[in-house]
Structures are given as C-alpha cells and as structure tokens.
Curated annotation (Swiss-Prot):
Disruption phenotype: Defects during gastrulation. Functions as a GTPase-activating protein (GAP) for RhoA/Rho1 during gastrulation by converting it to an inactive GDP-bound state. Residues 91-244 form the CRAL-TRIO domain. PANTHER family: RHO GTPASE-ACTIVATING PROTEIN 68F (PTHR45808:SF2). InterPro entries: ARHGAP1_RhoGAP (IPR049592), CRAL-TRIO_dom (IPR001251), CRAL-TRIO_dom_sf (IPR036865), Rho_GTPase_activation_prot (IPR008936), RhoGAP_dom (IPR000198). The lineage of its organism: Eukaryota, Metazoa, Ecdysozoa, Arthropoda, Hexapoda. The modification Phosphoserine is found at residues 29, 31. Pfam families: CRAL_TRIO_2, RhoGAP. The gene is RhoGAP68F. This is Rho GTPase-activating protein 68F. One of its GO terms (biological process) is positive regulation of synaptic assembly at neuromuscular junction. GO terms for molecular function: GTPase activator activity; small GTPase binding.
Length: 476
C-alpha cells in the first residue's frame, strides 16, 4: 500500500504497562498513570456501534475478529479537566506550517526519535492531509529503526480523530512504518486512551503491543530516551508541571554544569574512550593517526567480507545491553575482542562512540555552516565543503572523519548486498556527526546535515585529494 495514503499517529495505549521481554526494547513506565481527562477527546461514537469489519482476516499486525464489541468498564468516573482549553492559545501560537512533527534526536542506540503532538492536529476535514505531510517528513528515516513519541494532551473538539479513522489509517500504513517502529511512547496518557486500546486490543499482535510504553512525566521520557535536553513546546512543559507538581527540575545552572564537567574530566580515567572529548582520547590512548583504538577495532571488524555486505548494516539496532557492557569494558581499559560479537552490536558500538563524544565530530563551530548547506549554490558546494573540512576542522577531527568516511565508502561499494547507499548512510550518520550545542535538532536542520554527509560520501575523492599535512594550502 502506498505510504502516502491515509495515516494517523498511533494514539491508543494499553490498560497497563506492557512487559518488554526483549532486551533491546526500553522498559515501560512504572509510575502511576494520570487520569486527567478532558471533556473533548476522540470521537467515540463508533466504539459502541463499530462499523462491520471483515471476518477473520489478517491485516498487518491485526487479526480481525467477528463483530468486536467494546464492553465499557463500570463505575468509572474520570476527572474532567479543562487543561486543553487553558493551553489552547499557547499550542496555537506554537504551531507553524513546518512544525507538523519534530525530530527530537537519537536515542541511546542511535535510533531516530520523532515527536507528534495532538495539540497540533488540524480540524477533522484537514486531518488526512496533515498526517500525509507527516509521512513525507519522516518517510526517508523509517527504513531504519526509529522511535515515535506521541504527546497525547491538547486535542480539541474539532480535531479529534474517530476510532474508525485510526483503524483504517493503520491498515493502510506502509510496512516500514510498522516494522521498523521499535518503541511508541505515549506521554501523559489518559483514561480514554486505555479505553481505546481495549477496543483495538483483540486485533493487535503481541509483537506490536510490546512496542507501546506509557510515560507519565518528561523526566521519565528523558531517561527512557537517554536525552538530557528535549526541545518541547511550552504547552507540553506546562502540562507536565501541572501533572507532576512535586517533581522539581533536576537541571543545575549552566555554570555548575561547566564546573561539574571539568571536575568529571579531571577525575576521568585515562583509559576512557566513550563520553569524553576526542582530544582527551588522542592524548591518553595509543591512537595511530588520531584514530581511537576502539574505532579502529570496530572498522576492522566490520570491513571483513561477509560482514560489510550484511543487509541493513547500521540500520538495525544491536543489543543494547551488549553495547553498554562493551563500552564499560573499553572505558576500564580492557582489550575487547570483537571477533564473536554480532555485526549489529559492533555497528551500534561505533555509532555510540560518535554520539557519546563530548563535542560532535564535525564540531559545534561548523553547525551553522553545515545547516546552511542546501542554501549554497550548487556550483559552490564542492569548494565550500572542501574548505570547511580541510581548514576548519581540528586535525584529530579531520583525521577521524576522513577515516570513517573512507570506511563508509567501502560500505557503499557493497550496496547491492547491504542496501546501504550514500543517502541511507547519511541518514544514519548525519545526526551522529553533528548536533546543536544548545537545543535538539529540528527536521529542518537535520535535512541539510544529512545532505552534507551524503555530498561528502559521493565526493570524497575530491575532498581528500591531499594529505592532512598539506591542508593549509589555499583552495581556489
């Protein structure tokens, strides 16, 4: 089915937190769910009298049974809060035509994270086109494993989707959207979400059901995603403060962050290679040509015939617990042997190294230049990219970036088998090569970053024509 057909965010959630038995999946929330329920929610007119569904037909993750009926829970008296009306003005002010969904960053396993907000839904008549635009924005990324965060609160009477709309949208959704979705976080769930889920539950596979995790606070979300900073709309933050009044901000003042970081680096064991500046590694580890030992080991292991041509290399997520265990061993100074380690774990270890650097490999200084890549005239891009890389990158960053690019080019050479084109590799590595100093990177910013990396991969011979020691030569 065409990915651009009707689609809606996966809104429903289970009545209780699911148990995720796969070590790769984040654990569900253990905190209590909030039962703050507004008067205006999803259109539930089809719940008590659903449209006839096909009998015993398998559709994706759903198995359609004969005439499913919802049995409403008795003695339920949810609170009818009016926070959506209170926050409506803020949500409307925040919404812009280009902000249908947000790119929130990458999680601890390097998977892209996208945020969808109920407060941004348009009226029902425009909802189908709205979600089609969301599909266009994230479709290039869903060929890889990805995470979806749905911020539930903020619906109004004129934009609440019907249960039938959700059902039809899911059935028509492209396979990659369903298959490669690894976790669906529902933030600030309500009682009605659980009712909706009970209605759909008989038709949903156990595999898909395990992907859903309830999140009751933004602190819990940050911890689950492994992101200390989340750029979220004010109305979401205000609602979180209201629902979690006892939770105080855990972020210390910037000055104390800087002091703590300096103290931590001072106490850091010289064997550390993860979570430290690249210069720190070069100064304290046996780095040949500024290449950290663990990076060289990963690249050597992944370059072997039969490994480098693995289909989906760098797309699939490796076992998170194995990756974390290897990182701890490396930071203790142990000599790790990767010969018997799964290819996706090694690939995840390499991505984790880049993501854990104290400063991105392409440096904060180049962020504005790189995010302006698509605005450059095409005839000037080669010259500008070459100058940025040769003249503005510190020597150790230049050497490591060159080393990884040359490896990724070898991965590209096997694209007939591994399906990893320059564009696919750019989507995976772009957010791990460069990110913003102060805020999360938006979809508008990630596009030029990925395009920049794609350009480098396709034009690497021209960019790296001369040796690093000759980088001071001017470029005409």
């Amino acid at each position: 089915m065409d990915a651009h057909s009707r689609f809606a965010p996966r809104l429903p959630g289970p009545a209780i937190n699911p148990i995720v038995d796969n070590s790769d999946e984040p654990q569900p929330s253990l905190s209590d769910l909030h039962d703050f329920e507004p008067k205006l929610e999803f259109d539930d007119t089809e719940l008590l009298a659903p449209s006839p569904l096909e009998k015993d037909v398998m559709v994706g993750d759903f198995v359609l049974a004969e005439d499913p009926e919802l049995e409403p829970e008795e003695d339920v008296n949810p609170l009818e809060d009016d926070f959506e009306d209170q926050l409506r003005e803020q949500s409307e002010n925040f919404q812009t035509p280009r902000n249908k969904c947000d790119f929130l960053g990458t999680d601890k396993q390097g998977r892209h994270i996208f945020g969808i907000y109920a407060s941004r839904f348009p009226e029902k008549s425009q909802l189908e086109g709205f979600v089609r635009e969301i599909i266009k924005e994230i479709e290039p990324f869903v060929e890889n494993d990805y995470i979806l965060v749905y911020f539930h609160q903020g619906l109004k009477e004129d934009n609440k989707p019907s249960a039938q709309f959700l059902w039809n949208s899911y059935k028509e959704l492209d396979r990659n959207f369903r298959k490669n979705l690894k976790t669906l976080y529902v933030v600030h769930p309500t009682w009605f979400i659980r009712v909706i889920w009970n209605f759909f539950s008989p038709f949903i596979s156990d595999k898909f059901r395990k992907k859903l995790v309830y999140i009751s606070s933004l602190d819990e979300l940050r911890q689950a995603l492994g992101l200390n900073k989340l750029k979220l709309p004010d109305n979401i933050c205000d609602l979180d403060d209201k629902l979690n009044p006892s939770r105080k901000p855990s972020t210390p003042p910037p000055s104390s962050n800087i002091n703590a970081s300096r103290q931590q680096q001072h106490k850091m064991a010289t064997t550390h290679q993860f979570g430290v500046p690249l210069k720190f590694i070069v100064m304290n580890s046996p780095c040949l040509n500024s290449i950290p030992p663990i990076v060289r080991k990963c690249v050597d292991s992944l370059s072997i015939t039969g490994v480098i041509d693995t289909e989906g290399i760098f797309r699939r997520s490796g076992n998170h617990s194995e990756i974390m265990a290897l990182k701890e061993r490396v930071n203790r100074g142990e000599d790790v042997d990767l010969k018997s380690v799964n290819v996706h774990v090694i690939a995840g270890l390499l991505k984790s190294f880049l993501r854990d650097l104290a400063e991105p490999l392409l440096t904060f200084e180049l962020y504005e230049d790189v995010t302006g890549f698509l605005d450059w005239p095409k005839e000037e891009r080669s010259r500008n990219v070459t100058q940025l890389i040769r003249e503005k990158l510190p020597e150790e960053n230049y050497e490591l970036f060159k080393y990884i690019v040359e490896f990724l080019v070898r991965v590209m050479d096997c694209e007939d088998l591994n399906k990893m084109t320059s564009s696919n590799l750019a989507i995976v590595f772009g957010p791990n090569f460069l990110w913003s100093r102060s805020t999360s990177t938006s979809l508008e910013e990630i596009a030029p970053i990925n395009a920049f990396v794609d350009f480098v991969l396709q034009n690497h011979k021209d960019i790296y024509l001369i040796d690093v020691n000759q980088r001071t030569v001017s470029v005409d």
